[in-house]
Amino acid sequence: MSRAGSWDMDGLRADGGGAGGAPASSSSSSVAAAAASGQCRGFLSAPVFAGTHSGRAAAAAAAAAAAAAAASGFAYPGTSERTGSSSSSSSSAVVAARPEAPPAKECPAPTPAAAAAAPPSAPALGYGYHFGNGYYSCRMSHGVGLQQNALKSSPHASLGGFPVEKYMDVSGLASSSVPANEVPARAKEVSFYQGYTSPYQHVPGYIDMVSTFGSGEPRHEAYISMEGYQSWTLANGWNSQVYCTKDQPQGSHFWKSSFPGDVALNQPDMCVYRRGRKKRVPYTKLQLKELENEYAINKFINKDKRRRISAATNLSERQVTIWFQNRRVKDKKIVSKLKDTVS
């Protein structure tokens, strides 16, 4: 039998005892006296039933109990109904206080003046969720009006099952609100991966990839952290050449460091990126001798001759063609200088 049902049965027994003319017990009279003196029982205590000998005394006791309940802020429904029934007959028992439902204390609504004087609320916290096989990242930012004691007052606020205080930077924020011009907006990025029980924080300079989504699951847009990466690595690809020095130490790094505290590497010890032409490689004496002999025979070459020279000198056909072009330009410069000296 439920608690409400047991209370109803006790009320019926009290009504039957009052009709038979049984006198009220000492405990009932003491409870009625306590209610009359302004004391109120807690809402978790057992219900109190009082049998009275006269309707006027029952009405006075019920009124005193109702006044005490109103003064303490708790309302017990059903009291007015019992008091109305007690005034009809002097032999009927009256229930002084019968809690039918857990008492609820309503909070007063804020006045318009208080709402207007309230500071602007802080930006809402972005919560990340972990549905199925998906990967969801979230960004929590806090700025104006965020208080440290507000975080302490809500310890149950969580981010995917983890407390918000663990991943929010509250250093420098006092118990009072900080003006907007003194506190910059700070944020921490937290990511959740499939198969991991706890989130982790991002490290600048690393790319976060998205796990495979199953069929029927919505695909959400993920972000890629690109701090520390040069723009040319992705925009231009690897079409251009990258050159490194010959005697390169073991600890040299190619990527630029994204942490401001790191010491910059020396220029000769690191690889150099060049978008221009290749580094000039001088030809050997045998290659130059073969090219000079062919140039002395004919300053212009055809396709067959170019292929034969390329096979003999171990050079590409393009290198052979460019060498002949440069050799002709050199002859023109020599001739022009001779003319200038003669004139």
From Swiss-Prot:
Pfam families the UniProt entry points to: Homeodomain, HoxA13_N
Localization terms from the record: Nucleus
Chain segments carrying region Disordered: 1-28, 78-115
Annotated phenotype, changing residue 306 to G: In SPD1; decreases the transcriptional activator activity
GO BP terms, alphabetized: anterior/posterior pattern specification; branch elongation of an epithelium; embryonic digit morphogenesis; embryonic hindgut morphogenesis; male genitalia development; morphogenesis of an epithelial fold; positive regulation of transcription by RNA polymerase II; prostate epithelial cord arborization involved in prostate glandular acinus morphogenesis
Superkingdom classification of source: Eukaryota
Biased composition (Low complexity): 85-115
InterPro entries for the chain: AP_axis_regulatory_Homeobox, HD, Homeobox_CS, Homeodomain-like_sf, HoxA13_N
CDD domains attached to this UniProt entry: homeodomain (cd00086)
One Gene Ontology CC term in the entry: nucleoplasm
Family designation: Belongs to the Abd-B homeobox family.
PANTHER family membership: HOMEOBOX PROTEIN HOX-D13, SEGMENTATION PROTEIN FUSHI TARAZU-LIKE PROTEIN
Connected disease: Synpolydactyly 1: Limb malformation that shows a characteristic manifestation in both hands and feet. This condition is inherited as an autosomal dominant trait with reduced penetrance.
Protein name, per record: Homeobox protein Hox-D13
